[in-house]
């Protein structure tokens, strides 16, 4: 896996372009593991990996607004949830689709993970590679998949494009990374659940759920983990602000 990512990064830097990669497969098969290992290949720092892993468009927009140079990798995790094809008309999706046309000025590699492959056309048409995670091997320690090179500019139909080869990667990553990732993800999941509850007419229940998550989140522990993983003050600030902003969703 590392050689595939390293070659793409080298080509992207040399040719001043970017590559967009979709990683698909059933839940728990190792899509996020691919993204984390791939991003670590570029940054060699797990705190930087977590900083450049996005669960919603607003965090990405905030980061890229102040960027003055392109960075190696960004990850849109669980993209099928917050970038669903059914949301193609929403302004965040439209803006992101437009911004991805300028992705070479932002990130050299952009990785999307999703079980459903249900991304809007303005995202799909910019993809360069699709990696389908197919099986778990070696007693759950490795994931195997197939790399497809996109050869058309339409939404998913009957083919992913040309088969480039088979790829394998570790399904696990360090425990501290998993713990920090789980804290961040739990807050984002709570927000999406609350939004669904509000849309169904259960606003008070949604507030209570968010409050419960707020009380359970250990920000001090998250800070400790980011430092332990090699993060600097700016990494801590950015990641912590994302979590706090999400927890304040119903209190702004």
Feature names for model-found ranges:
Residues 31:
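Conserved lysine of the Walker
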